[in-house]
Amino acid sequence: MDNALKAEVLIESLPYICKFQDQKIVIKYGGHAMVDEEAKSWIAKDVVLLRFVGLNPVIIHGGGPEINKAMEKMGKEPEFIHGLRVTDEETLDIVKMVLIGKINGDIVSKLGKYGGKAVGLSGKSGHLISARKKIQYIIKEDEKIEVDLGRVGEVDSINTELIDILLEKKYIPVISPIGIDSQANTYNLNADIAAGDIAGAINAKKLIMITDVDGVMDDINDPSTIYKKLTISQVGEMIDKGIISGGMIPKIEACVNALRKGVDSVHIINGKIPHSVLLEVFTEEGIGTMITRD
């Protein structure tokens, strides 16, 4: 890249740096970018740069593949119902060990390596995420049946004061999706859904979902079929038609939830693309799929 092109890239970012100055951006960190060392580095660099140019990033991370590996090592078979992990007491201990004990610390360390002041938290920290047991239903033979997911929860409320205090002091909160109720019961939370709830609660400008796909596509195997922009009503129709299916549905539902709670836009991007977070935030064309209100 010659000097003129480098300068052009920097100049292109200027209006977006101004536009998002002091704004909160929630990043749901998941997928391949969590296990690939090179991807871990460029995601960390992206987030630290956001902080240094005046944005307020908040990370909430998943860890499904690593939880599955840990369960298999301990002789437990992962079980899912509608994309949610069935979580008995032993599974909950594994989830906490992996999310809080390993992944969260790894992310904090990586951000620190590149100059970021990161603080690792779980939803239990200062009652950051108050939760309740999730009631789940399935349709079986045209009958609605309640199923027990165990220690799976859903968000009741977010302690926004704690997040705001950290952001005011220029820290980057890194949050594990573990919730707690008033009786000190602990719950495993879907990270996508928790990210949407947090984004809405703290009045984030953007929610960025880091995934393993380029965005929402007609054909998952054909990147040219990507939708650059969608609205809430459009994604609803796409779910009904089966265009959006499987594990993408909870992500889209989390996106819609965030938008309905006041987030301006949600972006589904591919974490396998180098510096995809910066490309989304600081370029005119952006990257991935953007979803907005109608």
From Swiss-Prot:
Q: Which InterPro entries match?
A: AceGlu_kinase-like_sf, AcgluKinase_fam, ArgB, Asp/Glu/Uridylate_kinase, NAGK-C
For the site labelled Transition state stabilizer, the residues are: K28, K251
Where is substrate bound in this sequence? G63, G64, R85, N188
The primary site where this protein sits is cytoplasm
Instruction: Give the EC number(s) under which this enzyme is classified.
Output: 2.7.2.8
Report any one BP term from Gene Ontology.
L-arginine biosynthetic process
Compartment(s) of residence: Cytoplasm
Query: What catalytic activity is recorded?
Result: N-acetyl-L-glutamate + ATP = N-acetyl-L-glutamyl 5-phosphate + ADP
Q: Which domain of life is it from?
A: Archaea
Write out the entry's keywords from A to Z.
Amino-acid biosynthesis, Arginine biosynthesis, ATP-binding, Cytoplasm, Kinase, Nucleotide-binding, Transferase
What does the record give as its pathway? Answer: Amino-acid biosynthesis; L-arginine biosynthesis; N(2)-acetyl-L-ornithine from L-glutamate: step 2/4
Keyword hit for Transferase:
yes
Output the Pfam families linked to this UniProt entry.
Answer: AA_kinase (PF00696)
| GO molecular function terms attached to this record | acetylglutamate kinase activity; ATP binding
Which of the seven top EC classes does this enzyme belong to? Answer: transferase
Q: Which GO terms describe its cellular component?
A: cytoplasm
Q: Which residues form the signal peptide?
A: none
Family in the record:
Belongs to the acetylglutamate kinase family. ArgB subfamily.
Which NCBIfam families would you find in this protein's record?
argB
Entry-linked HAMAP family: ArgB (MF_00082)
- Please explain the role this protein plays, according to its UniProt record: Catalyzes the ATP-dependent phosphorylation of N-acetyl-L-glutamate.
What is the name listed in the Swiss-Prot or TrEMBL entry for this protein?
Acetylglutamate kinase
Species per Swiss-Prot/TrEMBL record: Methanococcus aeolicus (strain ATCC BAA-1280 / DSM 17508 / OCM 812 / Nankai-3)
